[in-house]
Structures are given as C-alpha cells and as structure tokens.
Amino acid sequence: MHADNWANKAKQMGYRTRAVFKLEEILNKIKPKKKYKNVLDIGSAPGGWSQFIKKKYRNTNVYALDILDMEPVDGVNFYKDSIENIDNIFEINKLKGAFNLVISDIAPNLSGIGAIDIENIFELNQMTINVAKNYLNSDGIMIMKTFQNNMLKTLRKEMEISFKVVQTFKPVASKKQSGEIYLFGVK
C-alpha cells in the first residue's frame, strides 16, 4: 500500500497519523503475552500512537511526553516537556519500574547535514533506551524508531546490554525510500 493510502486509511479510522499502522504491525509481530497496565509514549505528538494504544487496550494508563503541543486524547495523560526532564515529572517518575511498554516515535528536526542528523538521532535513541531501562518493569517492552545509519550497530549493542531480546523491524506502512526502522527490546 502506498504511504498516501496508509494516511487515508488512518484518517478514515479516526487516527491522527498513519504511524499507528507501524505500531500495530510491530505489536502483532511480537504477540505480547500480557496486557499493558502502564504505557509511556515518548515523542508522542501528534498523538496517533497514544490514541491507538488507548483504543486497543482500553484499561491501560497512557502517559505521553513531547516538546511539541498535542491535542488531547481521551484517557491519555500528556506532558509537554523534554525527554531530558522525565525524572522531574512526578506522575511519570512515581511509576518508575512499573511500565509494561515504552514506545517512542521521537525524531529530531532534520538539518539536512547527514553527520549532524545521525548524531542527533543517536542521542535521542540513547536517551530513550535509558528511560526504558529505568522505567520498564522486568519483561517490559520497548519499541523505538531509529534510522538505518552507521550508528545502528552501536545502538543495538547498547540495547543488548539491558534487553534480553533485541529485534529490528521495517513496517510495511513505512515509506520504502525512508531509512526509518524500529528497534524492539524485551527487558
């Protein structure tokens, strides 16, 4: 299906973004054995992933974080702040070690200068991994967007230190020409 078709399908289903189909595909592939009580959505704007999680797992507590504004999603606790300040957000910090799922579709604003963009992406990915290590419970799951670049192997090795399982996914809903991929880890 073409990217525009995914966007149209998302709109028809009431979702804010086609990225929901990327998350749905990854969750279907990993077939989680449990329900998610607490979910942390990092880089949540415009809110499609939070919206999808809340719709699929109605009794889940969803905590969303982004530096950008996000229109409210029913039942989602949104915090306009940086991932760097997550430990200062009381409602999230009190659940340290109690999240079943950390999802991150976060990406920096791209400059067009490859070396700078790769470094910025890598830095955000490292912060996401650190948050997941600290906030996930045992057997918790992390799903994180990254990009195919020369830092991917380093990123995977870093994840393998703290996660029992590490896998890479390229969802069908991702644009074919995009270097975007997703890393999945089980703590």
Regions found by a protein language model. Give the residues of each.
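Conserved class I S-adenosyl-L-methionine
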Residues: 35-45
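Conserved beta-strand signature within the Rossmann-like core of class I S-adenosyl-L-methionine
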Residues: 139-146
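Class I S-adenosyl-L-methionine
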Residues: 146-187
